[in-house]
Amino acid sequence: MVYSYTEKKRIRKDFGKRPQVLDIPYLLSIQLDSFQKFIEQDPEGQYGLEAAFRSVFPIQSYSGNSELQYVSYRLGEPVFDVKECQIRGVTFSAPLRVKLRLVIYEREAPEGTVKDIKEQEVYMGEIPLMTDNGTFVINGTERVIVSQLHRSPGVFFDSDKGKTHSSGKVLYNARIIPYRGSWLDFEFDPKDNLFVRIDRRRKLPATIILRALSYTTEQILDLFFEKVIYQIRDNKLQMELVPERLRGETASFDIESNGTVYVEKGRRITARHIRQLEKDAVAHIEVPVEYIAGKVVAKDYIDESTGELLIAANMELSLDLLAKLSQSGHKRIETLFTNDLDHGPYISETVRVDPTSDRLSALVEIYRMMRPGEPPTREAAENLFENLFFSEDRYDLSAVGRMKFNRSLLRDEIEGSGILSKDDIIQVMKKLIGIRNGIGEVDDIDHLGNRRIRSVGEMAENQFRVGLVRVERAVKERLSLGDLDTLMPQDMINAKPISAAVKEFFGSSQLSQFMDQNNPLSEITHKRRISALGPGGLTRERAGFEVRDVHPTHYGRVCPIETPEGPNIGLINSLSVYAQTNEYGFLETPYRRVRDGVVTDEIHYLSAIEEGNYVIAQANTNLDDEGHFVDDLVTCRSKGESSLFSRDQVDYMDVSTQQVVSVGASLIPFLEHDDANRALMGANMQRQAVPTLRADKPLVGTGMERAVAVDSGVTAVAKRGGTVQYVDASRIVIKVNEDEMYPGEAGIDIYNLTKYTRSNQNTCINQMPCVNLGEPIERGDVLADGPSTDLGELALGQNMRVAFMPWNGYNFEDSILVSERVVQEDRFTTIHIQELACVSRDTKLGPEEITADIPNVGEAALSKLDESGIVYIGAEVTGGDILVGKVTPKGETQLTPEEKLLRAIFGEKASDVKDSSLRVPNGVSGTVIDVQVFTRDGVEKDKRALEIEEMQLKQAKKDLSEELQILEAGLFSRINYLLVAGGIEAEKLDKLPRERWLELGLSDEDKQNQLEQLAEQYDELKHEFEKKLDAKRRKITQGDDLAPGVLKIVKVYLAVKRQIQPGDKMAGRHGNKGVISKINPIEDMPYDENGTPVDIVLNPLGVPSRMNIGQILETHLGMAAKGIGEKINAMLKKQEEVSKLREFIQRAYDLGTDVRQKVDLNTFTDDEVLRLAENLKKGMPIATPVFDGAKESEIKELLQLGGLPSSGQITLFDGRTGEQFERQVTVGYMYMLKLNHLVDDKMHARSTGSYSLVTQQPLGGKAQFGGQRFGEMEVWALEAYGAAYTLQEMLTVKSDDVNGRTKMYKNIVDGNHQMEPGMPESFNVLLKEIRSLGINIELEDE
């Protein structure tokens, strides 16, 4: 493998054995591709905005004299970029402009004669745009639209599994689900009649639908039954024989023909009998007359002489009727062929319970069921039925639905109409009856071939179509009513309903979620999440166990591990690493093709349905170098089951061992050694890790860290290769390689970095450059690390030296003992940024004012405010401090005589306003890092706002002019090169000012042309600079668009530094979570023979019962990695020769059996080896991919190479006594995370505060500044102790004795610690409640 300069800085040793056939795909493509499909113009009109427009337009007037046609659309440029939208709290969106054509036809002229055509571009609201990272900025906050897993449109056959009826009889049903429109259900009842429901309403006999489709009884029977034909000859009854139909029956008479008796009376008819009959080609047999009694006739029989109906279709024959038929000359009788085995009489029975007899009565019956209480008319009934399933406006199966429908009915073509046909309905009924007869299978609803993914683009398109349909009605009215000659398309379209529908979807849909932005992994996981909830999906309460369960088809498509614990378990899933959706929205996963027993590198993506037809080998199957299977029998999956197959039966093989799991689970090393429940917790807790101040790459990783860090978008990645020309904390400039430049550009790429920005979860987003001046860069290299990334690798926590041993009960029940060194070195110190906003509104009594002149506030409280009343940047504030001074006018109150006097003397007006300043919440302290002031248009800006504006302008100017200088320098260096090549001496050029170079002429015409081109570019650059600066200035100085009634908003950003402390929650990556119980002095911690103390002591009892052994293997491997790092560090300190260093590092990389990674350090220069060693001295990072990781033998080898005992256990000494512990302890390095459940956010203390209105008891919870509830059980405890006075205090003055607590407070202030308990308010509430039941209780004084 060839490494780029940047990749050579630190190479992760990979223990993976299987070759990587397929690179990990871009992890956010499910979001970006879907949205791209939505907004890009599709000439076919199959999907996106184009499809929505084409489905609604053209809109015709009721009279048909005019229509509004759609021509095309375009999306404009967004007004603000993403960052500006976040700061200003607006939506990042682009205006949608649609070109419409109004066509007016001549009234009297023949059809289609055009009178007038008007074309115009119409504004149709704003469409939110997706950022490069797959998110949306809605009202300033980043949101994610989660993909939905819903039931695919199509037809499904199912059964109730015997749960509906008490007899336990299995009732089958079929359901046709369209993409939009009414559902059509067919179901059997316990009496085996077939019923139909429309939209889950009252059920009707299924034949009503057929009658409504104009079928007669005869035609219905003809469709569903085979006929048995009897001939009456010479007063004898002969039956046309189909021998196969006799199978399994018992002969009720001798079956004979031409004197041969084939079956005797009373004998069961077997296959042998049938073969004999077929062999002898017996076509007719004579049957006794009684045999036909009770059979059902297949058609109407009429006496031809009189026209009298002798017997109607579907009536049972009797001997009398038979005689009548015979007399009237009918010699051929057709009856229905039914039996109890596989030809049930269901439709025949259903026709009997069907109250209708013709089409009209059927339509009326359907109308009554759909619109109960409305009087049916023929026209209304016909329209209703037509619109239900046969109108393209109201009903659409969609391409997916039609494909699934046809596949289910075993048709060859997969395309077709989006509405139902007669044939569709009959085929569904036939298949359902077949299933009832025991032919065919019911579908599995939870199979991923029956559930599809609906992504952002599709949901947005549906929402947009809803908005368009609302507009359509209004347009129809306008076309019919308005004066068409003066109307323009713009007058007809009201963009409000469209933008409202879109806004509603992005702002408040259940699937539009506030992005989880704790760390890069939580962002990526949120975007790859798949939810079964949401509109058109399941509900938590109704979802049973089957839906939530892992299904065999989840393999390689949906992760079996990563799902929330709690009520949503199994309903919210995560996409597997390699999974993608196909054109129909079904999940597919890649496999390697196997041809003639050889595994090729040809990759096919298979959906769940296609996969069922193949035999698929696992990724860890042993292959030889040519790709043949080593073993004769191979473990494979086929039709959802695992079993052994011979090697020539195999069709496909898995692409990778990580194929099964999601991104989150693929980051857990040794996942294969963890119990699934703990792995689930591990995968979920990684998403809650808070980015630490100094990111630290995991010593033991899985090799996925780089992919996650780069794809998440938190790092700055080089778009093109080049050389680093300039680096500072907030900007990186790359001079692009010649071969990657576009013709005629300056060839400079500038990357501006994000500094100290607040994330959605109040953690800190900050980018730091990780390249140096002059370094060569290749496309795709990481230039700057974001939060939780270290040299372009995901780094959620810190590598800690852990020991598994008990320590004085401080690690009882998963508690964690931490060394003070961890705090001193700031290993788990995190920065949290809070945004506090102060809003100044216009009230009825006058505007609120932001000012430093606040009544009744001392000088000290105002010391951190400037003259405008806004806090300085850099001020350190604590709970209760004023951040923004604000006063609100209050109503005139009745003045006391004293106040009147004071007013008269001093003219004091101060009491007209009350203090409503923004203060720091209790328990929060931090540093002000930024202040933003937003002022409404037309409101005068205060001094601070103008200062901020000036600063922003200065900064913008500085940024742009620096950019210009860099680009100019690039341009002039090319001009210089050109002029020198053209024969001008370099010394002479240096004497001339650079601007004059452009005036020089060259004799070579070609070079002169190039020079003129560059001169043009230079002018363009300057012009562009002026334009950009002007645009920036306009943006900064314009007023802000604030909500109605808001004059000013001041936002203050506080940075809070939080060190780790007892009560904080920590976890490893294997579901091993705990709470810090104590921070122990370094000298008290257990230490090894070298005197190195451990950082963290964990309880060994947390491992065996939880079966997450992965943490132990990680600890051993981490120890080995650290040992090798220490050896490298020792060699660097001794300043050993580079050759020795190279040899040792090479040994470490080469260690292990049959690993795929080949690192050849001989191709590295000495400087590169030294830089690599410098980055490896803290420990050599190791990758152990999921299900393909390091073996025990390899871990032992690595431990020995690092000069450590191969058992992974060492002798420890007690830090307090210096005594040796009696047995060896497992010590190593484990990657620990600090989770976003910090004690500072959870704990608070209350003295006095607010009370509940009715019970007068203190509120609960930190948000309400509430108290700690002393509940029923706690009262029992005090009663049991007999602590009477404590109990009295708890139930009265400490809770809801209103007078008592007020007195108590006064007494404490006066230094008199007496208490006088009174009547608790809750007792009064109880009295009131009893009185409300009509029982009067009164308390009497004795």
Swiss-Prot record:
PROSITE patterns: RNA_POL_BETA
Record's catalysed reaction(s): RNA(n) + a ribonucleoside 5'-triphosphate = RNA(n+1) + diphosphate
CDD domains: RNA_pol_B_RPB2
Domain of life: Bacteria
A single cellular component GO annotation: DNA-directed RNA polymerase complex
Sample GO molecular function, one term: DNA binding
Enzyme Commission (EC) number: 2.7.7.6
UniProt xrefs under InterPro entries: DNA-dir_RNA_pol_bsu_ext_1_sf, DNA-dir_RNA_pol_bsu_external_1, DNA-dir_RNA_pol_su2, DNA-dir_RNAP_su2_dom, DNA-dir_RNAP_su2_hyb_sf, RNA_pol_bsu_bac, RNA_pol_bsu_CS, RNA_pol_bsu_protrusion
Family stated for the protein in its record: Belongs to the RNA polymerase beta chain family.
Subunit structure: The RNAP catalytic core consists of 2 alpha, 1 beta, 1 beta' and 1 omega subunit. When a sigma factor is associated with the core the holoenzyme is formed, which can initiate transcription.
Function statement: DNA-dependent RNA polymerase catalyzes the transcription of DNA into RNA using the four ribonucleoside triphosphates as substrates.
Protein name per the record: DNA-directed RNA polymerase subunit beta
UniProt source species: Erwinia tasmaniensis (strain DSM 17950 / CFBP 7177 / CIP 109463 / NCPPB 4357 / Et1/99)
Gene symbol of the encoding locus: rpoB
